Amino acid sequence: MQIITTTFIQKVILGSHQLHEQLSIVEARMIESAIVSMLTESFCENEQTLKYLARLLSPMSYMDVINARRGKKICGYPLCYKSAAENSSDGFFIHSMYCNNYHSKCSLYLMRQLSQTPLHERRGVHLTSYINLEFDDMYSVSLLEELVGSEVPIDTVKSLITSFKDLEFDDTYKNEPLPLDVYFGQLTTDEETCIE
């Protein structure tokens, strides 16, 4: 599998679209198609690469990435290179979308933050020649891994716990305890912050 970097995305996928600030519908579809194609056989180098890529994705295009990776029997989370898990049902093996429950939740957490605005309406988000702080605010995402590994206000943790109850997208590991669930279960309400 190939490792995808931010530089690769800027040169190969966005390089030919630097002449104007507004993408046409056709150009936006070309970029989305290139991203899906690229991530079908590769994975993101690090969290920063995935966050950069998220600026260009919508929930629908992200689902295309997950489904394309599932077709190749690769974990649907773009930071992962492992094989998707297998379930045995009536003698048939069904491939899950993810390698484990944690990546399922990481993926859904990311997808819920992606902008619904079509890529061709995101003015200048594809340009690589300058940094626009407005895009960093409008289209930036945080990853679940970052929240788990840092100091988090208790209100954020409580809202995460509440939203996790709705994250039943891939139930391959539904009955398996998740280290994150154990971690959140140990928190008390009188703590102001939690540290991993």
Curated annotation (Swiss-Prot):
Keywords: Cytoplasm, Hydrolase, Metal-binding, Nucleus, Protein phosphatase, Transcription, Transcription regulation, Zinc, Zinc-finger. One of its GO terms (molecular function) is zinc ion binding. It is found in: Cytoplasm; Nucleus. Its EC number is 3.1.3.16. It catalyses: O-phospho-L-seryl-[protein] + H2O = L-seryl-[protein] + phosphate; O-phospho-L-threonyl-[protein] + H2O = L-threonyl-[protein] + phosphate. Zn(2+) binds at residues 75, 80, 99, 103. Its main location: cytoplasm. A zinc finger (RTR1-type) spans 52-123. It is an enzyme of class 3 (hydrolase). GO terms for cellular component: cytoplasm; nucleus. The keyword Ribosomal protein does not apply. Probable RNA polymerase II subunit B1 C-terminal domain (CTD) phosphatase that regulates RNA polymerase II transcription. May have functional redundancy with RTR1. PANTHER family: RNA POLYMERASE II SUBUNIT B1 CTD PHOSPHATASE RPAP2-RELATED (PTHR14732:SF0). Belongs to the RPAP2 family. This is RNA polymerase II subunit B1 CTD phosphatase RTR2.
